[in-house]
């Protein structure tokens, strides 16, 4: 059972915005940034400004302090909770509220997932006038220690006593003074203070703005963004730290293409998809899902929805390093993966060979944000599509499918599984697929890839007769 915040001894007052008092507000809902939303009512009972209150939950009565005022709304921070919600729980992290890494630790996990499901449904309806024929059961898993990828900012702050390593403070460019993190794997959380001490000793302490974290099944990699070369003393310190904490250091002197392993050289990052007998090597700068446990469940769900058969030809768009392509190749006759990055395309090809499915796969590098109907026709007929775009969505792909459907010139897949990390672009693309390409939205559901944040990942199934 969730631990509720003790009831405040202060009482709500109808004169809540009298001089010297913090105004009182009843919270009706949460927005997409996990802020409580309420509306001021004037003395005549007429609705007034909308107030977005950080730290407030639906059903609560709170006092608040506004830090930004606009003609139709205000942004505020909660001051006191006069009537707490049954959904409120005690945050696990000592730095919650200051650190910007999480925004929902004060909200019960079941309520977090329910709110994300509502955000998905609201986006589909308000942006595309769509309701899914079925809402899938949410995909969820461990809510702590799940974040296998992270970008940590490094900054020397004399007033704070030295080097800080961590996420930014909430809505700030400052680095949170954090000594642990509940959503990072425990061994990484325990490394934050030693990392601060390490950077403090380096000659390039003030020329190393960030550390990129990537955790694999057996290896933890730390990519140091170095604006100046390291010296021999730095090298010795890095080697000692790597041996002590069992990590691998990579150095990035310029752009992403300059990333190279420093020490040890023989370690290899990978993750596995045991259900399909897949081992997926990757580099720390490759795109991989943040939450490995949820990714396994997501891949299984996506393939069951797509239901590839032995004779099927499947197109995997935005395929990355082959996260869906390789499992699909275990089940279908042929899978074609298209990706916009040359490096990821090459890695997908290597991974297909590593897993013995190169005979059932082929890969190509294309700009999928500019793909046309003619481009899709040139690829030939496919029985099914899997689409897993970045936050920008798959607008060009959706438009191309709509054009093919309306012209009647070219084959269309009977089934599309769309994995999304942005409910608004999913809704936009779903509108095109349903209203212009003739598909039905058979089902949709949320994937709680990022517990304790407002980030909404989702999956949707489209079918066409």
UniProtKB/Swiss-Prot annotation:
This enzyme's EC code(s): 2.1.1.190
PROSITE patterns the record matches: SAM_MT_RNA_M5U, TRAM, TRMA_2
InterPro entries referenced in this protein's UniProt entry, alphabetically: 23S_rRNA_MeTrfase_RlmD, MeTrfase_TrmA_CS, NA-bd_OB-fold, SAM-dependent_MTases_sf, TRAM_dom, U5_MeTrfase_fam
CDD domains: AdoMet_MTases
Enzyme kind, highest EC tier: transferase
Region of interest called Disordered, as start-end residue ranges on this chain: 1-24
UniProt superkingdom: Bacteria
Pfam families: tRNA_U5-meth_tr
Catalytic residues identified in the record: 421 (nucleophile)
Catalysed reaction equations from the record: uridine(1939) in 23S rRNA + S-adenosyl-L-methionine = 5-methyluridine(1939) in 23S rRNA + S-adenosyl-L-homocysteine + H(+)
GO biological process terms on file: rRNA base methylation
Gene Ontology MF terms in the entry: 4 iron, 4 sulfur cluster binding; iron ion binding; RNA binding; rRNA (uridine-C5-)-methyltransferase activity
Alphabetic keyword roster: 4Fe-4S, Iron, Iron-sulfur, Metal-binding, Methyltransferase, rRNA processing, S-adenosyl-L-methionine, Transferase
Domain TRAM: 16-80
Coiled coil regions, renumbered to chain: none
Binding site for S-adenosyl-L-methionine: 289, 318, 323, 339, 367, 388
Role played: Catalyzes the formation of 5-methyl-uridine at position 1939 (m5U1939) in 23S rRNA.
Recorded family membership: Belongs to the class I-like SAM-binding methyltransferase superfamily. RNA M5U methyltransferase family. RlmD subfamily.
The name this protein goes by in its record: 23S rRNA (uracil(1939)-C(5))-methyltransferase RlmD
Organism of derivation: Burkholderia mallei (strain ATCC 23344)
